[in-house]
Amino acid sequence: MKKIALFGGSFDPPHYGHFALCTLTRELFSPEKIILSISKNPLKGSANAPEAHQLAMAKLMAEELGKTGPVFEVSDWELRRAGFSYTIETLRHFHAIEPNAELLLCIGEDNYQIFEKWKAYQEILQLAHLVVFARSGTQGEQQSSRIIPPERYTWVQLDLPLSSSDLRREIAEGQDWQAKMPSSIAAHIAAHRLYQNEK
């Protein structure tokens, strides 16, 4: 069966941690495509960079990833909708486009831990197989598997020391941050003075 992996997020900004997740997903599951869907998360509030720059940086990320194989694409469907994004609506959208494909929903352990707070999470489990990325050594799988049948998720452990929130702080404080992302994204951030007013 055709597989399509979906990464939802603000990518605010994208960094090499995101790249590692995307390339590992391709290696482990061999999806026909990996969609980077720019989202407005109702549990996290508004993004820091304007939406146009979020989209531009995600496209730069897809271009860099595309150098390793033509698998990656960007969707702005969630951005173009009014209000916050809910994962169930995004999954319904892509399921309608690809009704015969298996959807892989890639999430972090932090979202896995609060999965029961997600809108229509039972339907999410019907529409998609979860791929949960967790830091090595955590016990989150045992803590949260009570609501997710074991056949509906795959637990992947790896170490990702990078985070977008830390990067935004480092940029605002004038620290050395450029090496943590591809040069094209770093150049975009510098040219448009993004995250300069972060506190």
From Swiss-Prot:
Its EC number is 2.7.7.18. The keyword Protein biosynthesis does not apply. One of its GO terms (biological process) is NAD biosynthetic process. Keywords: ATP-binding, NAD, Nucleotide-binding, Nucleotidyltransferase, Pyridine nucleotide biosynthesis, Transferase. It is an enzyme of class 2 (transferase). The keyword Calcium does not apply. Catalyzes the reversible adenylation of nicotinate mononucleotide (NaMN) to nicotinic acid adenine dinucleotide (NaAD). Pathway: Cofactor biosynthesis; NAD(+) biosynthesis; deamido-NAD(+) from nicotinate D-ribonucleotide: step 1/1. It catalyses: nicotinate beta-D-ribonucleotide + ATP + H(+) = deamido-NAD(+) + diphosphate. Belongs to the NadD family. CDD domains: NMNAT (cd02165). One of its GO terms (molecular function) is nicotinate-nucleotide adenylyltransferase activity. It comes from Chloroherpeton thalassium (strain ATCC 35110 / GB-78). InterPro entries: Cyt_trans-like (IPR004821), NadD/NMNAT (IPR005248), Rossmann-like_a/b/a_fold (IPR014729). The gene is nadD. This is Probable nicotinate-nucleotide adenylyltransferase.
